[in-house]
Every structure is written in C-alpha cells, then in structure tokens.
Amino acid sequence: MKKIIFVALAVVALTSALSAKPKNKQGEKKMTFEEFTKQTPYNPGKPNDAFAQYFIGQSYLGPISTEQVGIFAVTFEPGCRNNWHVHHAEKGGGQILVCTAGRGWYQEWGKEAVALNPGDCVNIPAGVKHWHGAAADSWFQHLAVEVPGEGTRNEWLEPVTDDVYAKLK
C-alpha cells in the first residue's frame, strides 16, 4: 500500500511540475491534436481503438508503466468521454486519475460533475459507477493509474448521453 501511495504522489508531483507550460494563445477550442500534444507532459500514444466502443469521440492511449502498477496517459479530443463504468475488485482495486493537460470532467453516479484541470487528482474506489472525459471545447489528458487489487475487472455500461453532457458548465 505504501508503494501505491508513493507512486501516486510521485506522479502528481511530476505532472504538476511538467504541466506548467504556456497555453495556446488561440484558445483550446481551435487547438489541433498536434498543438495540444506539444503542451502535454506525456506522449498521447495511439488511437484507443481497442476501447473505442466505450467512448463517444476519439481517445488516445499511451502506456507509461505496465509493471507493478499500470499507468496510462489517456488523451481525449474535445467532447470525448468514456461510458459510465465501474472498476470492480474483491479487495483493493479502483483507479486514480491525475490530470495533466487541458480541461475535463469527472462524475460519479448520482452526484454533480466535477471540473478537472491540470494537477487535479481523483481517487476512485472500487465499485463506484463513474465516467470521465474532455470538456466540450478543450482537449484533455490524464494519467489513469490502475490501483492493484484482487479479482479486479472493469464493467462498461451505458454512454453518457449528449443531453446530459450538454448541461455541464
């Protein structure tokens, strides 16, 4: 458990230091993928084709670490979000999101959505139904940290509908 906390704190510290890059003067809405990736601290990876069925819009997946603790850079185009989903575990498990660039959203089932900005960290316990993704007018990148556990699995659920997403301010 101490290793997980240490890794999470190290990732947050590194991300905060690296994300202090200047913003695009044109505004993020007009920013291209190439422009956005120049200001992100992590390589966005490749199109997230393996999980495309669970996303509205284009996302990209870049592995940062696949040993000990899985850490992946997930990059979302403006308006892109994943479906509602749950990270199940018999013991431990869950997910940690560390926001690195752009603006995004996180929402737990039955609660108000929370705006995400670089340096923000979200701890998601196992068993919590939630979604996350980019703001409508901004590219967004976060690190997804897979919290180790026993009997872990993901359950992908219904999409976040356009009418629900459009109400976010």
Task: Label each PLM-derived region with a short phrase.
Residues 72-91:
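Conserved short histidine dyad/triad with adjacent acidic residue
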